[in-house]
């Protein structure tokens, strides 16, 4: 096999013409491009099996069709973990499972682990750094077996369920250095399990030495273990992300939501 980053028809034709011995084509593709893969393969004349070797929600590089999710300073509005869950399940059911008789051998969900590269380090990854599983793991179990796990991950239904100073992420929140602010998240647990809250603030496009999500900036949040918090904005002008992880500690399940904001 060989792997393509998209299902570009001309690239597929080149493979057919120059590497006819390849018997399985692998395609890495993300929403919204996944639905077009089969048609592109057929248009190019590919008649052998194929695999979707990466799939997931819309990538950080694919935001032009959703301009409201690109903030004036370049920050990107991220889906909640529950919104991502819905995207993973829809992608598999509508574009992978249904094509098993059209040559699709299967798929690899991106990312089975936690993210260690990329523009936004919470964008992908079905596990957090503690090893807790996000709702997308539940969705994939359902996609693969027809049954959800006995215990489900916490739910943060939409981006409207995390607010900073009463505003949602798309409102392009700008605050002054050292200003006082507040935030809250609305989360539920399908099984009624107790939930814990873990808030953090990080500067945009920073990472730990291994490329993963860094520890939050200390000294800003009064108490980061509540569903409603008060915090001081960083003293340094720049762009930041406010992140909350909501955990069912007993069952090692987690949900997340993010609000970008700018200090000016």
Predicted regions and their residues:
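Short, surface-exposed loop/turn segments at beta-strand-coil junctions that are enriched for proline
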Residues: 232-238, 251
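Surface-exposed, flexible coil segments in extracellular/virion-facing regions
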Residues: 203-231
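Exposed beta-strand face motif in extracellular beta-rich ectodomains
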Residues: 181, 238-242
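Aromatic- and acid-rich polysaccharide-binding/catalytic face
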Residues: 8-61, 65-68
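Extracellular and select intracellular beta-sandwich modules with Ser/Thr-enriched
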Residues: 253-259
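Short beta-strand edge segments in extracellular beta-sheet folds
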Residues: 260-264
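Substrate-binding clefts and catalytic carboxylate motifs of secreted carbohydrate-active enzymes
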Residues: 42-209, 224
């Amino acid at each position: 096999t060989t792997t393509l980053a998209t299902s570009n028809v001309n690239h597929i034709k080149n493979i057919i013409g120059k590497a006819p011995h390849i018997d399985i084509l692998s395609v890495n593709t993300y929403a919204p491009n996944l639905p077009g893969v089969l048609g592109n393969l057929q248009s190019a004349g590919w008649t052998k099996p194929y695999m979707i070797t990466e799939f997931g929600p819309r990538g950080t590089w694919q935001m032009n069709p959703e301009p409201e999710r690109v903030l004036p300073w370049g920050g990107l509005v991220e889906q909640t973990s529950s919104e991502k869950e819905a995207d993973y399940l829809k992608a598999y059911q509508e574009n992978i499972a249904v094509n098993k008789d059209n040559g699709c051998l299967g798929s690899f969900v991106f990312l089975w682990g936690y993210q260690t590269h990329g523009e936004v380090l919470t964008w992908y990854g079905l596990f957090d750094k503690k090893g807790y599983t996000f709702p997308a793991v539940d969705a994939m179990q359902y996609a693969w077996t027809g049954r959800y796990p006995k215990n489900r991950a916490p739910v943060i239904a939409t981006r409207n369920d995390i607010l900073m100073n009463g505003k949602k992420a798309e409102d392009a929140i700008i605050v002054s250095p050292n200003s006082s602010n507040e935030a809250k998240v609305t989360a539920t647990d399908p099984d009624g399990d107790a939930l814990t809250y873990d808030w953090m603030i990080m500067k945009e496009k920073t990472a730990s030495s291994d490329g993963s999500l860094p520890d939050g900036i200390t000294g800003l949040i009064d108490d980061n273990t509540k569903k409603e918090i008060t915090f001081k904005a960083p003293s340094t002008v720049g762009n930041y992300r406010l992140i909350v992880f909501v955990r069912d500690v007993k069952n090692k399940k987690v949900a997340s939501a993010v609000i970008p904001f700018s200090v000016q």
